[in-house]
Amino acid sequence: MEAHHVKSLLAVLSLIALPVMAAEPTLYGRYEYIALPEIGGQVLKAKMDTGALTASLSARDIETFKRDGEDWVRFRLGTKDASNQVYEHKIARISKIKTRSEEDEDDNEVAAPTKRPVVDLELCLGNVKRTVEVNLTDRSSFNYPLLIGAKALREFGAAVNPARRFTADKPDC
């Protein structure tokens, strides 16, 4: 009878451990390829940045407008090889971003945070697709047109190994 109780206890414990094991994050490198199904299926090199809160996509000609009483944004992809295709998305919210220069303690000048439109955008990393909040800004002076911040990393159940690069396969969603 005691062996039966031990087996039952082990069975219950293994069931309890399953969600914990399933919650183990997927390990990605500091840089990964990410597809944007809603932006013409573009595949971009992205920087996985745990120090940034939100994701940012390089965009140009960013223009907000009203459609049926709701706030929308129209933009072009801001990458070297981008076409002139115009994309339109409903605005999820407006983010207020502090730039590094605004965080400089030696600078006594108080600057207003930059306001950026945020859209809900489908991203594909490896074979995982998630909808995440992405703010639109001109990142043309940066090496990577897409920055994936901590919120999006959580959506993907991701952890980042900064010593690795491009660990996921090319996007396949």
Language model: regions and residue ranges:
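N-terminal signal peptide c-region/cleavage motif recognized by signal peptidases
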Residues: 17-19
